[in-house]
């Protein structure tokens, strides 16, 4: 299976992708976040990730999935893999997380105001992950994260 991240440049903060040992992916919608958590839990258990780190990874993936689907009905895809002692997650959704304000003075949520929930999700992601990137553009939202699991 091809594990390259399409559409990313080196300057976009692309995660290292050397020979993943496990790769799995799943499509989901906003209401499927509990299923994404179960999917991640099963992935981590099969990979042998320690219980405490697995709980952190499941929470981080759940928050990444929530970020990608936060603004309403959209479809998204979560990809999970392990390389060496690190677990990686990529979540891509076709919704718009952020848009430019009419005055061009900053980015705001698609609903028009900065979201406290979004800020909290990003804080949780930053605290749990060794690396996290959240990007929104015309093609949707992309969340990348990695954490040491061994």
Question: Which residue ranges define each predicted feature?
Answer:
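Conserved beta-strand-loop-beta-strand hairpin that lines the nucleotide-binding pocket
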Residues: 1-26, 69-150
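Conserved ATP-binding N-box helix of the HATPase_c
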Residues: 51-76
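Generic non-transmembrane alpha-helix signal with a bias for helix starts/N-cap capping motifs
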Residues: 37, 61-62, 118
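Small side chains
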Residues: 44, 60, 65, 87-89
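Bergerat-fold GHKL ATPase/HATPase_c domain
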Residues: 1-58
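Generic structural marker for isolated residues within well-ordered, non-membrane alpha-helices
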Residues: 40, 65, 122
């Amino acid at each position: 299976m091809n594990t390259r991240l399409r559409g990313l440049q080196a300057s976009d903060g692309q995660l290292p992708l050397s020979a993943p040992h496990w790769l799995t992916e799943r499509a989901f919608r906003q209401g499927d976040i509990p299923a994404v958590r179960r999917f991640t839990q099963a992935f981590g258990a099969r990979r042998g990730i320690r219980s405490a780190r697995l709980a952190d990874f499941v929470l981080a993936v759940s928050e990444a999935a929530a970020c990608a689907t936060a603004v309403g009905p959209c479809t998204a895809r979560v990809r999970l893999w392990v390389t060496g002692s690190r677990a990686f997650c990529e979540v891509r959704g076709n919704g718009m997380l952020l848009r430019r304000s009419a005055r061009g003075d900053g980015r705001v949520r698609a609903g028009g105001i900065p979201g406290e929930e979004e800020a909290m999700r990003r804080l949780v992601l930053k605290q749990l992950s060794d690396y996290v990137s959240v990007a929104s553009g015309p093609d949707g939202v992309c969340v990348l994260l990695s954490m040491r699991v061994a």
